[in-house]
Each structure stands twice: as structure tokens, then as C-alpha cells.
């Protein structure tokens, strides 16, 4: 009994530790001195509303009086402490799931990161820059308008950006939205106002880990039929040193059945491991109206020195999905074939649910996808003027049998 307890403790100690940094934030205009409480995740417009500095921009013509906000630089700041257990780990990373958009990140007054893309995650190692006690994290957001106008001025021609409401924004004909890796609709569209945001729009946290960790797992599906699913688990592992022996296993979470396993040596840095496996007579995933959208839960474990260094669980629908584009009497076909069955696509164009994306709750996401399913839709197109949606959005689509046609941004 004592041996079991010790083994469990060792396994727990090896797993990455996480601290969310969602409390104690404050913000201010960079050129002014007054600080105000801030909400993270959030954006500057919602923080200004919460502090009664501006009114609701969606009421009457309030939007017109708020175009000064995107011409200002903004600073967000908080403090945090890590436990001795986290400080004792070999590696400590600061991870931003989303920064909107041009941002310099400082830890204890040292610049550690420059961000320029709201669509991606940002990660940086911070262990050498941490203090044993209180640490100060500061983010300086540059005005996207001030950053991008020089790019517009430098060109002898103009990019097309017909929906950019530059005149409403007070920058005349300078449609700078095309220069930023940022949601296009923030600059105005034919269906919505111009509200160009800045802020920590997705979660931020610190993770501490030893030896190696799983960066990503993708279950590739080369061949799926009702008799057999041939699958490949593509596992990306980050190691902080050369490791002679590590074990990677994939199990079916519900039954605990081991589906694939491999002993590998890891090089320092990124390692990509492929684990082929198969499932006989799989329960297939079907779109809404054609059958049950069954999901398998796969767990991937990484073991180093007989300790679980990391684990990753993901729900996956097993299906064969193809675009059929073959010659016919009118030209070429263009339709979706799911598990060998032609699908009559019924759906809608999905645009972001709010100009201020952090306000969208999990409940709103679920209601939206469930409403689509209840309306007999089986596909949503993610419009290219918005953002790549949250993981929750795609998980709900999987759960309710909704196919996704994903635009690039």
C-alpha cells in the first residue's frame, strides 16, 4: 500500500503544473498615469466600459465617439508568485493563447516577447527571468492604427479592403486592416461597427515541466470504413535534453485498451513520433441527420524514467470525408461525401458572435451550435473576416454533428 502511494506521488510530480494568470490585472493609457482594474481575458473597450469611462458602443451612435481608442497605446500589468514546486521544475513557460495584436511583453522589466498576430498562440521560456517572490508581468499594446499607417504610406499602390470603414475611424482613405494579422471585421464591415480592439483576448498561464512534454497530438485517418479504421497518431514532443528511452502510448480512454505504443529516443528540441493503429468495426461519426456523431476519446501518455511526463486526451470522430470534384455533363461536381454517402449541405455562414470576443460565453457557444443542429443544419462556414474559433466551438460542432468549412484568415 505504501509503494502504491509513493508511485502515485511520483507520477503526479512529473506531470506539468499550470498557474492561470487571470487575476489582479490593471490597465491604463500608456501616456497617462491613472490605472484601472482590468478583466483578463478581455479587451480595452470592455475594460473601459466596466470602469464607466465609455458607454456601450452598440447604443445609438456611441461608436462614432470611440474611434480615439484604437489610436492610443495601452498597458496591462499584473503580479504573480509561483509555488516552490513550480519553481523547482526544470522548465517554466509563459503561454498566451491570444494577444490582440501588436504587443511587447515584459517580465520584471525585461522584454521577453514581441507579438504581432492575434490568431496564434505565443509561448516563451521564463525560468531565468523569474524571482522567488513577486513577479511583475507587463504588456504594452501598440495602437494597430499607428503601427500600420506607415506601411500604407510606404506603398505606391493600395490593397483592396472595401469593407474597412477607415473614414469612420478618422484615418480618411487609409484602409490599414490588410496589414494586420487581426480580425478584419474589427475595422468595420457592412454588417457591423468599426471597433478596433487591443488586449489579452484569450487565457494566459504559466506552465512548469521536467524532461519532456507533449506539444500536440493529431489522429490522422488515412482510411476509415465501417469494417476498419486505419489511424496514425501523430505526436509532437518537446524535450529539454537528449533522452535515451521514452515511452509513448495511445489508449482508448473509455475502456483503457492500449491501441498503440512505442519506445523512442528523444533529441533535444522538437520530436515527431508516428504511431499507427487500427480499430475494427468502428462506430462512425455522422453529420446531423445522417446518424449519430459518435466520438472516441483517445489518451496519449508520455513516460520518461517510469514517470508520466505528460498526458493528452482528445475526442475524435472517425469518418471518411471527401470533396468529390469529378467531371459531369455540366462541368464538374462539387459536394461532400461522408463515409461513402453524398451529403446535401445545409447550413449558414458563421461570423463572430461579438465585436468583443472574450464576452462570448461557453453557454452562448453551445446554444449557437445546438440551434444550428435543431434547425437541421449540418454545416457551418467559418467566415474569413473573423477569427479561428475557440477549441470549444469545434468540439461542440463535433458533438452535435456539424461539419465545418473553414476559411483562412
PLM features per residue range, with description:
Residues 1-380, 399:
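Secreted/periplasmic carbohydrate-active enzymes, especially glycoside hydrolases
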Residues 379-409:
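Aromatic-lined substrate-binding rim segments of carbohydrate-active enzymes
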